[in-house]
Amino acid sequence: MFGVGIFEVLVILIVAVIALGPNKLPQTIVDIVKFFRAVKKTMAEAKETFDKEIQLSEIKQEALKYKDTLESEVNKLTKDIRLDELREISVDSLTKPLQETKEVLSEEAKNLQSTLESLNSDISYESSAAAQTPTTQESIPTDSTREIAYATQKPQNSIDSINSKESSVDSLHSPSIVESTQSSSSKDS
């Protein structure tokens, strides 16, 4: 235990017998043994307590690791749940208005298509009627014919716009436009 050999123990006993005497030596040996037992017991208890503390600290560290992993997983799940809710909300909130807008646009497209077809049939009817009944009557164009002529032309630059205005004024005096405006005004009345 202390690195003491047999020879050294014999030397210590001889010195103790001479110093203490034969009467006090047995009591001193008992006291020394009790002292070493108490020191050994105290050291064992300290070691045991130290080991328990180490185990507790390891358990605490493991518990903290588990706690951290659980918290991170819970945070991930709550984020995923929030994202799923947002996706559902955004998908539902976007698909319904888009579907309604699509339906409205398709109805408007059908209305525009039918209006276009009716205008095409009116124009073809008027052009066929104008080809069958030629007239030589010239009159001053009305405001509605000017609006039609200007609305149908789209000049690209200033020179084209001047030329197109001159040609539209000349075309307004033509007999076919005058007849078409007169026939459309008679239909309206």
Curated annotation (Swiss-Prot):
Residues 153-189 have a biased composition (Polar residues). Keywords: Cell inner membrane, Cell membrane, Membrane, Protein transport, Translocation, Transmembrane, Transmembrane helix, Transport. The keyword Transport applies. It is found in: Cell inner membrane. GO terms for molecular function: protein transmembrane transporter activity. The keyword Coiled coil does not apply. GO terms for cellular component: TAT protein transport complex. It is a single-pass membrane protein. InterPro entries: TatB. One of its GO terms (biological process) is protein transport by the Tat complex. The chain crosses the membrane at residues 1-21. Coiled coil: none annotated. Its main location: membrane. Residues 152-189 are annotated as: Disordered. The Tat system comprises two distinct complexes: a TatABC complex, containing multiple copies of TatA, TatB and TatC subunits, and a separate TatA complex, containing only TatA subunits. Substrates initially bind to the TatABC complex, which probably triggers association of the separate TatA complex to form the active translocon. Belongs to the TatB family. Part of the twin-arginine translocation (Tat) system that transports large folded proteins containing a characteristic twin-arginine motif in their signal peptide across membranes. Together with TatC, TatB is part of a receptor directly interacting with Tat signal peptides. TatB may form an oligomeric binding site that transiently accommodates folded Tat precursor proteins before their translocation. NCBIfam families: tatB (TIGR01410). This is Sec-independent protein translocase protein TatB. It comes from Helicobacter hepaticus (strain ATCC 51449 / 3B1). The gene is tatB.
